[in-house]
């Protein structure tokens, strides 16, 4: 079963028809759109600022999404694939990437 944890009173929100691998970790202020896949070993850590993921996004094995301490939001648009072991740290990615 995936690690989905509330942090600082905020629980992740996961859209419809999403696949979340059993050892993926989704923590804190994370919103995932519809029809997404979060693969094995991926970590989405919305501990100090939010992470917003659009629809039809593929976060592949071992990827890490994390925010910076100074007012950064990680935003991933619609129809995006973050490749194996990708690191998205305090950055935004537009649609169709």
Indicate where each model-derived feature is located:
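Terminal amphipathic alpha-helical/low-complexity segments used for targeting or macromolecular assembly
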Residues: 1-17
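Residues at secondary-structure transition points
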Residues: 9, 47-48, 54, 70-71
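A structural motif detector for beta-strand N-caps
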Residues: 12, 17-20, 24, 30, ...
């Amino acid at each position: 079963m995936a690690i989905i944890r509330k942090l600082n009173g905020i629980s992740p929100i996961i859209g419809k028809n999403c696949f979340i691998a059993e050892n993926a970790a989704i923590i804190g202020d994370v919103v995932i759109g519809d029809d997404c896949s979060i693969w094995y070993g991926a970590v989405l850590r919305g501990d100090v600022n939010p992470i917003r993921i659009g629809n039809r996004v593929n976060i592949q094995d071992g990827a890490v999404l994390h925010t910076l301490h100074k007012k950064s939001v990680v935003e991933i648009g619609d129809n995006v694939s973050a490749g194996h072991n990708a690191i998205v740290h305090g950055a935004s990615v537009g649609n169709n990437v």
